[in-house]
């Protein structure tokens, strides 16, 4: 049988039909308050990685500089990104034009909700026309750059649309009136996104609830943020996964100095 490479082979023919069918199925539900036209779509269009300066001017994921990823000021300014796209070879399909079609179809179906997308490389997306068609720019793991993006693009409504369930994500939101909220990815653990070296683990263990529905520490942490009820929860961490260790005198010390600042997912994973 023919081996498909996924929906991308059928997107041009079926995108409008699929999008509108999804909206018809749920648009009367009161929990729907906005429509997303894409999740981290920048990965699927060439040039976006190179434009950001985060990947050593390549389009290769293995070249990503994690230190630059977390810095408050991205390596490439809007002017540099703009110049990159001016000189980039024209492609058959562009992310900006595709987004414009999806946003147009969404508004043909519903003008009462905002159109949003989850951006993983926003410094590129703000210069490709992608964000021009959005009512709200959603960000994937970008609390460190909220202030920068607000400064450079002050007229765009912004919020977190993929955030790990950790205090630093919520703290970045409540300290900034211009960040409308966060979306925790994910509320419950799910099967998938595991790599070969993580076998036999098959689930992604990031949710406030595990696969069996049992709460993790992060569940109670966010409960304490979002309710007036007093909350106390005590959890432990294994010595192997902890960023702390005991020295020769039995004192608790960091395995790597100041590592807690660089690995917020690690020290709060309980």
Where is each model-derived feature located?
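Flexible, glycine- and charge-enriched loops at secondary-structure boundaries
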Residues: 8-12, 92
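Substrate-binding clefts and catalytic carboxylate motifs of secreted carbohydrate-active enzymes
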Residues: 33-36, 42-139, 144-270
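Polar helix-capping/helix-linker motif
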Residues: 7-8, 29, 176
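Beta-strand-loop-alpha-helix segment that lines the small-molecule cofactor/substrate pocket
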Residues: 1-4
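An active-site-proximal structural segment forming one wall of the substrate-binding cleft
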Residues: 11-34, 108
């Amino acid at each position: 049988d023919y081996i498909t490479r996924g929906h991308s082979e059928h997107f041009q023919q079926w995108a409008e039909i699929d999008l509108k069918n999804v909206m018809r199925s749920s648009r009367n539900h009161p929990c729907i308050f906005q429509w997303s036209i894409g999740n981290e779509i920048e990965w699927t269009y060439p040039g976006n990685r190179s434009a950001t300066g985060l990947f050593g001017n390549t389009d290769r994921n293995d070249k990503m500089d994690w230190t630059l990823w977390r810095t408050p000021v991205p390596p490439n300014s809007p002017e540099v990104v703009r110049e990159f796209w001016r000189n980039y070879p024209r492609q058959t399909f562009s992310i900006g034009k595709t987004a414009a079609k999806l946003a147009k179809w969404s508004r043909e179906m519903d003008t009462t909700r905002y159109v949003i997308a989850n951006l993983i490389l926003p410094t590129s997306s703000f210069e490709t026309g992608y964000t021009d068609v959005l009512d709200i720019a959603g960000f994937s793991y970008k609390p460190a750059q909220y202030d920068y993006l607000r400064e450079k693009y002050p007229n765009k409504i912004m919020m977190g649309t993929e955030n790990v369930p950790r205090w630093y994500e919520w703290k970045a939101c409540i300290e900034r009136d211009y960040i409308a909220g966060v979306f925790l990815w994910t509320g419950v653990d799910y099967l998938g996104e595991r790599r070969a070296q993580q076998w036999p683990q098959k689930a992604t263990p990031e949710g406030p609830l595990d696969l069996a529905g049992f709460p993790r520490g992060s569940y109670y942490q966010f409960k304490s943020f979002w309710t007036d009820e007093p909350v106390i929860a005590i959890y432990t961490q294994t010595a192997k996964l902890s960023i702390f260790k005991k020295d020769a005198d039995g004192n608790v010390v960091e395995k790597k100095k100041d590592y807690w600042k660089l690995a917020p997912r690690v020290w709060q994973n309980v």
